[in-house]
């Protein structure tokens, strides 16, 4: 598996880098949570902008982005608008989604931008190109909240993201059996061994899949999401537990 270095953070080497989500409705609550998370042992903060009540107001969006960048210090900022189709809070038209991504890119405040794979396949090259032009790395994401696809399908999806130009392909799936979790881990290992052009981020969701959030260094998932008090997805493990287990399972 290759690595990518962003603001001194090497993603894809050593223990998985930890992402903490911010899910809050108001500007004050978002920035208050950012200040709290900035002191915790993690590498990146994900702002889930679909929770923000004024996310489509460009002026409000720029103001929050600026406040987040100031609050987070050296931590990376990943900005995500998770649409309802991918398990998020709000639906957007393609133009609204493109406008949101454009505002994030030109703000100069975010190191990483989440771009959803399935809802935006036609627009994907343009969205990724726009981000790269602004110096923003792209996490290209796909979610299945009902099942775990076959290993072949998961690898095909992740490699398609690589081919579209994503810096960090991301896949989250729901297991219905322990063997589903093994399929996700096997697909992750296959990506690391046979398609190492980029790091990848993978997870099996829910309590059944929680183990996948803790063994990324072994199987090849470069980042993991931890719960700092309020989870943004099913199965996120408490931050202190994640840090302890990642240290215990370190291969270094």
Task: Show the residue positions of the predicted features.
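Short beta-strand/loop segment at the start of cytosolic alpha/beta domains
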Residues: 1-7
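Catalytic alpha/beta core domains of metabolic enzymes, predominantly
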Residues: 102, 112, 117-252
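Eukaryotic low-complexity, non-globular regulatory regions
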Residues: 8-15
